[in-house]
Amino acid sequence: MSDTITLPEVEERTDERTKRQPPYHVILLNDDDHTYQYVIAMLQKLFGHPPETGFKMAQEVDKTGRVIVDTTSMERAELKRDQIHAFGPDPRLPRCVGSMSAIVEPAG
């Protein structure tokens, strides 16, 4: 008598619910009421970008009017957009009365 047990073949399935969610961009929009120093500090605090990356992003938003500062899940992108909106005015500019603006767009 053999002690070997043979199990039936099991077909592997990919559950549709486990597919990754599509990525979204957090896009910072330019304005004239915030300094490069403000942008660099905000990007460092909210996204962990080093000062060099923050400076490059500040240059791009100043030149083109917008810059992608993060690509992530929709939920995190919305949170980061809201954090940008709540970051507060630039204390270096007396005329500055509020935060910068940002939007969320599909990355595709």
Identify the residue ranges that each predicted region occupies:
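Terminal domain-initiation and capping elements
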Residues: M1-G108
